[in-house]
Amino acid sequence: MAFCSASLMGQSVKTVSLELKNGLDKDLKDVPVCVKIDDLRAGFTVRSAKVMDSMKEIPSQLDDMDTDYVPDELAFVVDMPANGTKRIEIELNSERIVRQYPQRVFATMLARDTKKGKHAEIRSVTVPGDVNFYNMIHGHGPMFESELVGYRIYFNAKQTVDPYGKFEKGLELEESKFYPNDEQLAKGFGDDVLMVGNSCGVGALKGWNGEKAIHIEPVAFRTERILAKGPVRVIAEVKVEGWEYQGSLLNMTNRYTLYAGHRDLIVDTYFDSPLQKEIFCTGVQNIMGTETVSYSDHKGLVGSWGRHWPVTDTVKYAKETVGIATFIPRKYVKQEVSDKDNFLYTISAVGETSFRYYTMFTSRKEKFGFENSDSWFGYMNEWKKELENPVEVKIIY
């Protein structure tokens, strides 16, 4: 039976099936699955959901994507066998039922009182474009992580994605807040592993002036927020309103999604109206120093591997080795370019109101990571193949 519905004492319940198909000749772990609630045709406002893989309940989450307090998407991760299929059962409920799952991701944004040394949890902040709010947020922006990696997004015109590397898999940012103390470092905590400077860091979207990447300015307003906090995925957003760029006035949202078990970010960029001929760019940082090597397939995939100090304190902290990768689908790629800080592709999406690309990093300190640039660049190509051949999701009505 594809689906069934029931209504008991005012409570509505509906079960819907998904058919998942992996077309690759390899097992896949923690495959992200996201379905629109509207596409499930519940016939009522969904307040909770339960996802079953065979006879086992698996962690999932409902996310309110437009902040109207009504769930819009259901997300979970699932393992898939090579060349295999799975049938997933989803029970939708009109009542709010709290389900406890292991927290495999974490996100936070903290306003700080520098005089009192205190922090307050916040979900969203909007400031005029000419206001310097960078140091008013602990960590300079939203911070989020999976078991593998951590990230933060700078609350300024750079809007750079900055990485946090780990020795061991696990969640650390709730405790370390991106700045581990000496005791935490002695326990094996990770920390900031890259000095991003004026670069795009790990795949941040930038403007392009024909010669180099430029920051997102001037703008009328800038907003950063945490949209989803787990247990399966975290979503952070950066929104600018009134960006004066290449003769246009743009309202743009960059949405970063990180799933459990993943190091890669899904980067969705949205605009209020169709794009014209604006040219943007993204890619990977040309890591400072003389030890950086890069790789490109000249078809939207670019990576770098290098070693440099992550902070200005070169006495307390050692040089860090970092690998970065970004993949842009070919339909958006205009040209492969570079400047002194970055290896890049320019991007155009004429007539579109959104586009998607992907980015990730590794730190050499990872005990579960990559030995050298060759292994990293090899993994990049495997990653691209998986992205270009996603698991098929079919709703069975």
For every predicted segment, state its role.
Residues 252, 263-297:
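Acidic (Asp/Glu-rich), glycine- and aromatic
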Residues 186-260:
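Extended, loop-rich substrate-binding clefts of extracytoplasmic carbohydrate-active enzymes
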Residues 1-15:
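Bacterial Sec-dependent N-terminal signal peptides
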Residues 47-73, 244, 288-305, 326-332:
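Solvent-exposed beta-strand/loop surfaces of large extracellular or lumenal domains
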Residues 11-116, 127, 131-132, 139:
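Alpha-mannosidase-like glycoside hydrolase catalytic domains involved in N-glycan trimming
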Residues 16-22, 148, 254, 265-273:
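Short, well-ordered beta-strand segments enriched in hydrophobic/aromatic residues
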Residues 94-217:
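Solvent-exposed N-terminal domain segments of exported/luminal and surface proteins
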Residues 66-80, 324-397:
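Beta-strand-rich recognition/accessory modules
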